[in-house]
Amino acid sequence: MSRLLSVPGGPYAPPVPARELTVTAADGARIHVEVHGPERAPAVVLAHGWCCSTAFWAAQIRELAADHRVIAYDQRGHGRSPANPAYGTEPLADDLEAVLAATLAPGERAVLAGHSMGGMTVMAAATRPAVREHVAAVLLCSTGSSRLVASATVVPLGEGRVRTWLTRRILGSRAPLGPVTPLARRILKYGTMGPGSGPHMVEACARIVHACPRRVRHGWSQVLDLLDLDHGVRELRMPVEIVVGAADRLTPPSQARALAAALPDCVGLTELEGLGHMTPVEAPELVTGKIRALAAAHIPSARAERAVHAEESA
């Protein structure tokens, strides 16, 4: 589904994976997984956000797969992972743990990048054995750990009960999104992207978001409304870097700053002027560079490969 409804060409068109597999989570949920790049290359795992799919990471996959093994999966109910009646942060953690166990060798380390709900998945799974075993470093893009509805600035009012009530009604709406029209693009850009985002970026995100089933969109909106993962943030003991758009209306910079203050080992916080919530699409080179740098710094095989390349070019 995610490949059929995404843009057909350009940097945001989903690359064809080297292989695909279905992973079964603890409760029986079936999770669609794609693997790109050389099998023995340093591993990167990508977890997308609410209403998205593996297609959201197309730009990162395209660049990283040249010299990394890139593992991307569809969150339950999204993309090509079938819907499941279980909604909650524990099922998200179950799914991530199952993906790590199925795609990484015992003791193998990877960089884990999560955008929005994907970042929340990382926080929810912070104490899971598979995360402790396999995750060498984390990149959190445009995410938060609690008070999401209260802190969102989609509604242009001051913080308070009225704004929170209106935001809850908007984000939790059961209304169908319908086809991707010029009006739909304008609405999506206002809510999720910065003023500098080009039409090709808006088109890519609109196609991905509009492909999400209405029931799935609403079900996960209820989880995000009640989200409280502050405890999970404190359990992320590996190096963690954060990226946020300064114009992010869904998880504003205040969320990123709170994460940076709470993390045991925050190695950087980058606030991107003029960008919104969809940072991997709006700033693809920067996000890809952050992932690549974390892999080079924290995965032994990546460090060795970088040293070999340096010697060859000397």
Predicted regions and their residues:
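Flexible "cap/lid" loop of the alpha/beta hydrolase fold
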Residues: 127, 131-171
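Conserved alpha/beta-hydrolase "acid-adjacent" motif
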Residues: 249-255
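Catalytic histidine-centered segment of alpha/beta-hydrolase-like enzymes
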Residues: 250, 269-289
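Conserved alpha/beta-hydrolase catalytic His-Asp/Glu region
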Residues: 146, 173-234
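Short beta-strand/loop motif that positions the catalytic acidic residue
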Residues: 236, 242-244, 248
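Conserved acidic catalytic loop of the alpha/beta-hydrolase fold
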Residues: 93-109
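Conserved HGGG/HGGXW glycine-rich cap/lid loop of the alpha/beta-hydrolase fold
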Residues: 29-83, 89, 102
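Gly/Ala-rich beta-loop-alpha elbow adjacent to hydrolase catalytic centers
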Residues: 114, 118, 122
